[in-house]
């Protein structure tokens, strides 16, 4: 991942949070995200011909594949920060959408692992994550699975973790 101006060396927490907010706005679900040399490739299910929410009369389901280049990610991060800072009040974690929250807490966990690149998919709120890490003995992939209950528990603990 490119180092974004003003960001620490790796800031998957903020990058993934920004992508998650975008997904919430688009009404996507069951997503797959792959890190590429120049950004991210994302695939997910969306409702075409609707207002962005999942409803039976709101359209039909389509699989979309999106490419987010480094410049797109930087713009998402700037827009997300501007949205959160609008009005000057402390952002309300409760108003954030599911993907903004879940991607943020996954990003925080990923930052702690210090991977070289990432891949994950989500289905029904559960995530499978594959990280590529380089050690003195060489590179290797690591898998981790987070159930929907795991993610919800991590989301519930996130505000306290940020204060620590």
Residue positions per predicted region:
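Intrinsically disordered, low-complexity regulatory segments enriched in Ser/Thr/Pro
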Residues: 1-3, 41-87, 127-164
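Negatively charged, low-complexity tracts enriched in Asp/Glu with abundant Ser/Thr
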Residues: 1-30, 70-113
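Amphipathic, interaction-prone secondary-structure segments
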Residues: 16-51, 103-134
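Generic low-complexity segments that are intrinsically disordered, proline-rich and/or Lys/Arg-biased
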Residues: 9, 38, 92, 116, ...
């Amino acid at each position: 991942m490119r180092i974004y101006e003003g960001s620490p060396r790796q800031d998957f927490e903020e990058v993934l949070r920004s992508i998650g907010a975008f997904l919430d706005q688009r009404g996507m679900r069951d997503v797959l995200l792959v890190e590429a040399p120049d950004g991210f490739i994302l695939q997910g299910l969306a409702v075409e011909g609707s207002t962005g929410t999942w409803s039976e009369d709101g359209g039909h389901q389509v699989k979309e594949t999106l490419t987010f280049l480094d410049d797109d990610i930087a713009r998402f991060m700037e827009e997300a920060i501007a949205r959160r800072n609008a009005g000057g009040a402390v952002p309300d974690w409760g108003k954030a959408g599911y993907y903004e929250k879940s991607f943020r807490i996954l990003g925080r966990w990923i930052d702690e692992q210090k991977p070289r690149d990432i891949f994950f998919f989500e289905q029904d709120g559960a995530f499978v994550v594959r990280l590529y890490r380089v050690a003195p003995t060489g590179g290797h992939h690591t898998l981790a699975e987070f159930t929907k209950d795991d993610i919800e528990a991590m989301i519930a603990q996130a505000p306290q973790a940020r204060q620590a």
